[in-house]
Regions:
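A short coil-to-beta-strand element that immediately follows conserved catalytic motifs
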Residues: 29, 162-167, 219-222, 263-267, ...
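Short Gly/Pro-enriched turn/cap motifs at secondary-structure boundaries
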Residues: 195-199, 227, 272-276
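Predominant activation on well-ordered alpha-helical scaffold segments within soluble catalytic domains
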Residues: 18, 149-156, 204-208, 255, ...
């Protein structure tokens, strides 16, 4: 049984992680840390867990009693936490923030505010499963980055990312976190839509890093426009790139790339969000219009885009079945 500690357990990702782990056949939550909710029942904060657990939030962090710690902090807090606390070397870490996602060479090239030296493995199982399996520390990918990469990686494997890539993706309100803000209130978000961080989203360096790893080079720009949607969960992305291969060859390449993937699947028909919301799946579909390859990909931003993928990484790190605790039904209808 894998003994688990959770830091930052009161937010959306913390609550979703608890939901998964209390039903995980090979994991046990030892502590769920939240200074602001110390002593409160988890179900009083994450009300969807009424009747599911008697776990209480604690301010304590008994590192010596756990095998792995999940960091569910806001961005920038994980690095500071590790500088201030002595986490035993034998305890594995899975960080859901962006602090350690970029390799040192990527940090230098992009001048990102990320530590220049670290041993965190980028936790995208579709390309890094063998590295994750022996890793002590894993940096969980971003939600947009996961969805977009999984759409583009097979194309990169075929050497098709040679021209600028146009990406549009829309995300649910939970992607902004639990803390209320001007663009997360129901009265603003409902029946509304807007763009933000156009061409400057923090996940683009992650995407470029993985495409370069897969293709061997990357000279093309990733022109990414993110959208805020008026729904709670999910990301739906379109990626457009020029491609000179016939569609039959491209489809075959996508199916080959994901033939052994546990959660990412190529689908012959058009895809939609309800097929993936509440699951750890990513679905991918391609069409071709002249020399334009249109790729669509979709995920649940809190699951495959966050804690579902984190649990998948935990399973890999401890030699468990990747699907343990993650056999989830989509909202679908």
């Amino acid at each position: 049984m894998v003994k688990v500690g959770i830091l930052g357990a009161a937010g959306y990702t913390g609550g979703e992680l608890i939901r998964l782990l209390i039903n995980h056949p090979e994991a046990e939550i030892v502590f769920a840390n939240s200074e602001s909710n110390t002593g409160n029942l988890v179900a009083e904060v994450h009300e969807g867990l009424y009747g599911e657990t008697d776990l209480k939030f604690t301010a304590e962090m008994p590192f010596d009693q756990v095998d792995v710690i999940f960091f569910c902090f806001g961005h920038g807090k994980s690095e500071a936490f590790l500088k201030e606390h002595n986490v035993p070397e034998n305890v594995k870490i899975i960080d859901l923030a962006q602090d350690f996602r970029l390799a040192p060479e990527t940090v230098v090239a992009t001048q990102q505010p990320t530590p220049a030296a670290h041993d965190f493995v980028y936790g995208l199982p579709e390309i890094n499963e063998s590295k994750i399996a022996v890793a002590q520390h894993v940096a969980n990918p971003g939600c947009f980055a996961t969805c977009i990469q999984l759409g583009l990686l097979p194309a990169a494997k075929m050497g098709l990312i040679n021209s600028d890539v146009s990406v549009n993706a829309i995300t649910g309100s939970t992607g902004a976190g639990q803390k209320p803000g001007a663009t997360t209130h129901f009265s603003w978000r409902n029946n509304n839509m807007s763009i933000y961080k156009a061409f400057n989203h923090q996940h683009v360096p992650e995407i470029r890093q993985s495409l370069k790893q897969t293709q061997g080079y990357l000279d093309a720009a990733i022109d990414f426009i993110p959208y805020r949607g008026d729904f709670a969960r999910g990301i739906f992305a379109t990626e457009v790139v020029k491609a000179d291969k016939p569609i039959e060859e491209i489809v075959a390449g996508y199916k080959e790339f994901y033939k052994d993937a546990k959660f990412t699947h190529y689908v012959d028909k058009a895809i939609d969000l309800k097929q993936v919301v509440n699951t750890n799946k990513c679905l991918v579909h391609v069409d071709k219009y002249g020399d334009k390859l249109l790729i669509t990909s979709c995920i649940d931003n809190l699951l495959k885009g966050a804690v579902g993928q984190a649990v998948q990484n935990m399973n890999i790190m401890f030699g468990l079945d990747q699907t343990a605790g993650l056999r989830l039904k989509p909202s679908a209808f």
